[in-house]
Amino acid sequence: MNFILNNEQRKVLGLESVQENWTTINLKNQMIVFLDNKTIVKVIEYSETEYTEYQLSEIIDEDGLILPKTNKGKPKKLSYSSVQSCHKIGIYFKYETKAWVNYAMIGNHTTQKTFYSTNFEEINIDTFEKFSAWLHEWQKNFSEKDFFELETFKNETRHNIDIKEGDFFVFKVDKTNFGFGRVLLNIRKLKKDKNIIGHYGLLSLMGQPLAIKIYHKINPSKNINLSELKQ
């Protein structure tokens, strides 16, 4: 994929602009590393089927080695794999098209949240031409309200949430509408309390799995009377 976002496109995707004083290093496996003095601040990964742009904050020394975050760590040679293993921060953008999946997504590595994904709207962008058309429309229709919401999302901090069964939650289904759901089971708690008698595949789930239900309700505001969902 012979394509790199420009700064005007980055603005409507929440990404940091590339500055004129930054230097670039091209690594194997189609990766571009951007340096602000001695700090890696941005990375672009690209291939025939994928484009990803994300932020880092990693310092390199005079020999071009990535310095460790702690005294126990060791400097790492600047390479495709070492950059990929670095702790990603802030906003990222990803476009991927393969035989079984195609999507564009704006997310936040710091908060582990998604601002927008074409998957929610089932938009087909399985070719670069369709992706370019989608990006053009996204940029053309990007409003001041969208910019404010994206900046708010960009500056959010991560919160630990004590999830309880019966909790309601809200999620974006597109740029202007929200969907709603409810937590039915906290599977992690069931495993911890040893309340799962059979296996049923639940013991193999990774992360913090939840059983949820999604309501057939879309609303332009995340604020909704819960009685409407319970009907």
What are these regions (language model features)?
Residues 87-89, 93-95, 101, 188, ...:
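A short beta-strand signature
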Residues 1-25, 176-195, 200, 204-206, ...:
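Extended hydrophobic/aromatic-rich secondary-structure runs
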